[in-house]
């Protein structure tokens, strides 16, 4: 098992959630979320986060339909992952993210009811779930 720092993004066309985790412990925590316009984030905010945490690997959630087929946002998520690699030179992997938003909403609702369900928290929590599922697949 490696001791890498891994960052995950929950890609969305209007908002992108971020989480950070350690491979050695297999744990992750929510960081923040960023507003996006048609899937395009403020790259300066992404750069600041990458410089602060210096991840060894970045995981980007890949939104698929329930039957595993791709949708329009799947293509945009792939572009986002490619741009992360191209702009910042980070190693990027894609991770199936089916139902992570549903799971994130349920988790947040259990902890704080409707007040906890703001979009930023949901997206950052979805990024945590994406990263934890990546850890689970490896160990």
From Swiss-Prot:
Domain of life: Bacteria
Transmembrane segments: none
Pfam families from the UniProt entry: RuvX
Keywords: Cytoplasm, Hydrolase, Nuclease, Ribosome biogenesis
GO biological process: rRNA 5'-end processing
Cellular compartments annotated: Cytoplasm
InterPro entries per UniProt: RNaseH-like_sf (IPR012337), YqgF (IPR005227), YqgF/RNaseH-like_dom (IPR006641), YqgF/RNaseH-like_dom_sf (IPR037027)
HAMAP family per UniProt: Nuclease_YqgF
Name this polypeptide is given: Putative pre-16S rRNA nuclease
Species whose genome carries this gene: Photorhabdus laumondii subsp. laumondii (strain DSM 15139 / CIP 105565 / TT01) (Photorhabdus luminescens subsp. laumondii)
């Amino acid at each position: 098992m490696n001791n890498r720092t891994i960052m995950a993004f929950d890609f969305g066309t209007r908002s992108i959630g971020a989480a950070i985790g350690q491979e050695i412990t297999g744990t992750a925590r929510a960081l923040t979320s960023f507003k996006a316009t048609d899937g395009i984030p403020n790259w300066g905010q992404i750069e600041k986060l990458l410089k602060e945490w210096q991840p060894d690997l970045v995981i980007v959630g890949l939104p698929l339909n329930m039957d595993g087929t791709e949708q329009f946002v799947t293509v945009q998520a792939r572009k986002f992952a490619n741009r992360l690699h191209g702009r910042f030179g980070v190693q990027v992997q894609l991770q199936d993210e089916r139902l992570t938003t549903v799971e994130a909403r349920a988790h947040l609702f259990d902890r704080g009811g409707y007040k906890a369900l703001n979009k930023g928290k949901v997206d950052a929590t979805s990024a945590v779930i994406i990263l934890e599922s990546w850890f689970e697949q490896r160990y």
